[in-house]
C-alpha cells in the first residue's frame, strides 16, 4: 500500500538486484504482471526523484519496482546509501537480491552464448566472481534473498507472486478477439477457433446489416447445428488451459475466434465464450477487431 505522508502518497518501493543471470528480468516481469510500475536499469541516485514524481500522482503509482544492475563499486555504495536514506524518511523500501550458484550461472550464460558483463577479456567464472564480490555488501543488507539455482522461470514468477501479490492479482486475464480470416489472423493468439463451418448470416438478407452483437444474429448462430457442441467442447478445453496457465504462473492469454469477415459468427461465438470464461473466474476483455471493417 502507498504510505500517506502529508498531502502526498508515497509509493511502496522494491529494489530488485542481484547476480547477472539469476533472474532479475523474470522477477521484474512478475512484478509488472502484478501491476507494479517497473523501471529497468535505474541508477540508484535517481530513485528518490522517481519516488517524488510518483508521489505527485496522488496514489496513481502506488508501487514501484526498480531493477538495479550493479556493475561497479560506486553503484553499490549509491544503492546502499539511497536505500538507507529512503528508510530514514519512513519510505518502505525493500531490497530483493537474486542469486544462483556459480555452476548454474555458467550454464545459463553458456546456453544463451553471451559473455558476463564483468568478464572482460577473462573467463566467464572471473566475471561471476568479481560481481559476487561487488554485491557482497548489498546481499548482506537485502530484505529477501532468493536462490534461483533450482528454480525455472515459472517457479521464480510464482515466488514473486507469493511475496508481493494478492489473490485478486493472480487471476488469469484473457483477451477474447473476434476476427475475420480475410483480414488476417491475430498475431498474438494463444488459441484460434474457426467458426466458418457454421452457416453464414451474411447470406440471410435481414441479418446481413446486423452484427453478432445483435440478438437476431446471435440466436441464428447459436441455433445452427454444431454451435452448442463447439461451445461445450471448447469450454472444456479452456477449463484445462486456464487451470494449467495458472499453475505455470501465466497471467494472460489471447483467444481468437474467427469467421470469414469478423462481423457475425465470430462476434456471436466470442461473446458466448467470454461469458463462459468469466464463469471460470477469468477476467475477460472482448475485442471485436474487424467489426465495422467491410
From Swiss-Prot:
Positions with a binding annotation for ATP: 18-25
Top-level taxon of the source organism: Bacteria
Xref: InterPro entries: P-loop_NTPase, RapZ-like, RapZ-like_N, RapZ_C
Q: Where does GTP bind?
A: 69-72
A single GO molecular function, which one?
GTP binding
Keyword field: ATP-binding, GTP-binding, Nucleotide-binding
Under the heading Pfam families, the entry gives: PapZ_C (PF22740), RapZ-like_N (PF03668)
Q: What does this protein do?
A: Displays ATPase and GTPase activities.
Q: Which NCBIfam families match?
A: PRK05416.1
Q: Which family does it belong to?
A: Belongs to the RapZ-like family.
Q: What protein does this entry describe?
A: Nucleotide-binding protein Tfu_2020
Instruction: Give the source species.
Output: Thermobifida fusca (strain YX)
Amino acid at each position: 500500500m502507498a504510505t500517506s505522508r502529508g498531502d502526498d502518497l508515497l509509493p511502496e518501493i522494491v529494489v530488485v538486484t542481484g547476480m547477472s543471470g539469476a533472474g532479475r528480468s523474470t522477477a521484474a516481469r512478475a512484478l509488472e504482471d502484478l501491476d507494479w510500475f517497473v523501471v529497468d536499469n535505474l541508477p540508484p541516485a535517481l530513485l528518490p526523484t522517481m519516488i517524488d514524481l510518483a508521489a505527485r500522482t496522488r496514489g496513481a503509482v502506488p508501487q514501484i519496482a526498480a531493477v538495479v544492475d550493479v556493475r561497479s563499486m560506486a553503484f553499490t555504495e549509491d544503492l546502499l546509501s539511497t536505500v538507507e536514506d529512503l528508510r530514514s524518511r519512513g519510505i518502505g523500501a525493500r531490497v530483493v537480491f537474486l542469486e544462483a550458484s556459480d555452476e548454474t550461472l555458467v550454464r545459463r550464460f553458456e546456453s544463451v552464448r553471451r559473455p558476463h558483463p564483468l568478464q572482460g577479456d577473462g573467463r566467464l567464472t572471473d566475471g561471476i566472481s568479481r560481481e559476487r564480490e561487488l554485491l557482497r555488501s548489498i546481499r548482506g543488507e537485502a530484505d529477501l534473498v532468493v536462490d534461483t539455482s533450482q528454480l525455472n522461470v515459472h517457479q521464480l514468477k510464482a515466488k514473486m507472486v507469493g511475496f508481493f501479490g494478492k489473490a485478486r492479482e493472480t487471476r488469469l486475464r484473457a483477451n477474447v478477439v473476434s476476427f475475420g480470416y480475410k483480414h488476417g489472423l491475430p498475431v498474438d493468439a494463444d488459441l484460434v477457433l474457426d467458426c466458418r463451418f457454421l452457416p453464414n448470416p451474411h447470406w440471410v438478407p435481414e441479418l446481413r446489416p446486423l452484427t453478432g452483437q445483435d440478438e437476431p444474429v446471435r440466436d441464428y448462430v447459436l441455433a445452427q447445428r454444431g454451435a452448442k457442441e463447439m461451445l461445450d467442447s471448447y469450454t472444456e478445453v479452456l477449463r484445462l488451459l486456464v487451470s494449467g496457465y495458472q499453475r505455470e504462473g501465466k497471467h494472460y492469454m489471447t483467444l481468437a475466434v474467427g469467421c470469414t469477415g469478423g462481423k457475425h459468427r465470430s462476434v456471436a461465438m466470442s461473446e458466448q465464450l467470454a461469458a463462459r470464461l468469466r464463469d471460470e473466474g477469468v477476467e475477460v476483455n472482448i475485442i471485436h477487431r474487424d467489426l465495422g471493417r467491410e
